[in-house]
Regions:
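Alpha-helical bundle regulatory/interaction domains
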Residues: 1-19, 23-26, 32-178
Length: 178
């Protein structure tokens, strides 16, 4: 049986798929959950607090569920899959007043995923700490840049295919990055 907080979160994500963040009300959420307003306010201060909590929870789940990657670009796969799966919701979050918090959590997830890859990969053993930090920063920025561009373009191109093309271009043109 789902806990009340999870039910509220699920309703919030459903509503994000349907309408912009700024149009979602506490009333919409409690009606969707068949709860009363007091129950909502017992768990969350307001909708921005709910948004922050749910994005952080989403980020933590991606980090916990994805530890093994074959290449720096395959690190992006879990994020790409989530963005495609919840395209409208992420577009609505990105275009909302919670945009800064959303980008902060995206950065957190991307950095963690790339750091996990760097720790696992034998390609980086001989690199200096400074080189490892530089490469980690590069791949994190590349990941976030691609995701933000996709959101800015309203998701009008095949994100998964684009990431695969980028990976092949980097892989074939510069083995020194690996």
């Amino acid at each position: 049986m789902k806990k009340t907080k999870e039910i509220i979160i699920d309703a919030f994500w459903q509503l994000l798929e349907e309408k912009t963040f700024n149009k979602i009300t506490v009333q919409n959420i409690v009606e969707r959950c068949a709860l009363n307003r007091n129950t909502f306010y017992y768990h969350f201060q307001d909708i921005p607090n709910l948004a922050e909590y749910t994005v952080k929870l989403w980020a933590d789940e991606i980090i916990q569920n994805n530890y093994e990657f074959g290449s720096p670009m395959t690190c992006l796969s879990p994020l790409v899959e989530e963005f495609i799966k919840h395209k409208k919701a992420f577009q609505h979050l990105y275009s909302s007043s919670q945009k800064d918090e959303f980008i902060t959590y995206m950065n957190h997830v991307a950095l963690h995923i790339v750091q996990m890859f760097m720790k696992q990969s034998s390609h980086y053993v001989s690199r200096s700490e400074d080189e490892k930090e530089t490469l980690t920063h590069f791949y994190k920025c590349l990941m976030i840049g691609i995701l933000i561009d996709w959101l800015e373009c309203q998701g009008d191109y095949d994100l998964k295919l684009f990431v695969e093309k980028i990976y092949h271009l980097i892989d074939s043109s510069s083995q020194t990055l690996l």
